Every structure is written in structure tokens, then in C-alpha cells.
Amino acid sequence: MSNHTHHLKFKTLKRAWKASKYFIVGLSCLYKFNLKSLVQTALSTLAMITLTSLVITAIIYISVGNAKAKPTSKPTIQQTQQPQNHTSPFFTEHNYKSTHTSIQSTTLSQLLNIDTTRGITYGHSTNETQNRKIKGQSTLPATRKPPINPSGSIPPENHQDHNNFQTLPYVPCSTCEGNLACLSLCHIETERAPSRAPTITLKKTPKPKTTKKPTKTTIHHRTSPETKLQPKNNTATPQQGILSSTEHHTNQSTTQI
């Protein structure tokens, strides 16, 4: 398209140059015949035509240059943006498979070493062991790595990931449905049955209850020695005893006189 437009512009300029030549020849002929007024008008019109043609050609070249600059800049931007957004699915799948197999091999080797070297007795209840099931083909997320416990103790169970292949408690063989990995672990685990840890209950000794005894209030009365020798079966009130003792004392005093 650009070559075709340039060819058309060249043809138009060539025709204009030929027309200007013929116009100049005609003006020279008129000048020879002493027609000065006609020559002046013709020259003025020729100057106006040339100026307008130059302005038009300049505008055309500027517009063509801007149109050419726009498509050249677009492909460079697209080429720079394409490698950033491009991701190959083959490499991601290959990396995922390699990491998945390495994680499974490390977890199985650790569990076998723990079972053979150490006689660890698990204190888990039977309900927890029945609820935990192992699946042979477990799908782990690519971004997450399972925690590795170097001390040999059993890590806590993650309730969100039921397919986690790392936590392997005592598994009965009845739960393994044709899974070779589960059957191998089941045979190893049957050699040592889990023993339940004894529960120790502390009895609280009851505190002895202390009861306060009521204090007796003693009333001291002035009595004579005769009243002291009276028997305890006397049912009279203490006031009557006091009055009788005083009367007896006065009678003795009168007899002595």
C-alpha cells in the first residue's frame, strides 16, 4: 500500500511540473508581444499555485510519517509482553510429579526407620485409628510442603488435609482395600500392638469438719456450807435455796445470842 501511494504522488508532481513548464512558455510568449499586465497577473497566479502545492505536499508527508510510526511500535510492545505472561504447562506438571514422589519416598523411609529402631508405643484410642484412613494416591498441593519431624515423634493430625500421607498411626489390615503400601505398613504394625497408657486417678481426701462446742455460762452465788451439802435431786429454784439458807442463818444467830 505504501509503494502504491508513493507512485501516485510522484505522478501528480510530474504532471504539475509539466503544467508549470507550459505556463512559463506561454508567459514568455506574452512578454515578447509587450503584454505586461497579463504577464504580471499570470506570474502572481503561478506563485500562489506553487505555494499551495508545497503546503499540501508537506501536510501529506507528515501524515504518512505518523501513520508509519504507529504500526512499528505496536509489535515491539507485544513481543516484550508475551514472554511475561507465557507459562509452559509441561514444566509445571513435571516439577509437581517429581516433588510429589520425593515427598512420598522420604515419609515412608522415615516411618520404617522409626518402626525398626525404636519400640514406640502409641497411646491413641481405637476411635481415632478407625477414623484415620490412608489412600494410596494422595493429591498434595504444589505450593505446600508437608512438615518433617526430625525427633521421631508423631506429628499432630491436620484435619483440613484428610489425604495427608505423613501421619501414619496404627492401621488394621481390614481397612486396606488392595493398597500395597497400606498392606506393607499393616504387616509391620501388627508386630507391635498399641498398648493403651494407664490412667492415674488421684483421690481427694476430704477435709475433717470442725464443730464448735457451745460455751456454758456459769453463775456464781454466795451460799452457805449447808447448802453445799444438799443433794443434787433438789428441784427447787436457786432463788428459793438462797432464801432458805439466809433464814436458817438468821435463826442460828438468834439462838446463839
UniProtKB/Swiss-Prot annotation:
One Pfam family here: Glycoprotein_G
Polar residues biased stretches: 73-90, 226-257
Keywords: Disulfide bond, Glycoprotein, Host cell membrane, Host membrane, Host-virus interaction, Membrane, Secreted, Transmembrane, Transmembrane helix, Viral attachment to host cell, Viral immunoevasion, Virion, Virus entry into host cell
Keyword Disulfide bond assigned: yes
InterPro entries recorded: G_prot
Region (Binding to host heparan sulfate): 187-198
Extracellular side: 67-257
Transmembrane segments: 38-66
Sites marked Cleavage: 65-66
GO cellular component: extracellular region; host cell plasma membrane; membrane; virion membrane
Record has Iron as a keyword: no
One of the protein's GO biological processes: virion attachment to host cell
Top-level taxonomic group: Viruses
Composition bias, Basic residues: 204-222
Glycan attachment sites: 72, 80, 85, 87, 92, 105, 127, 139, 199, 215, 233, 251, 253
Region (Disordered): 71-93, 122-161, 197-257
Disulfide bonds: 173-186, 176-182
Residue ranges annotated as Cytoplasmic topological domain: 1-37
UniProt similarity note: Belongs to the pneumoviruses glycoprotein G family.
Name the record gives this protein: Major surface glycoprotein G
Species of the source: Bovine respiratory syncytial virus (strain Copenhagen)
Gene name tied to this protein: G
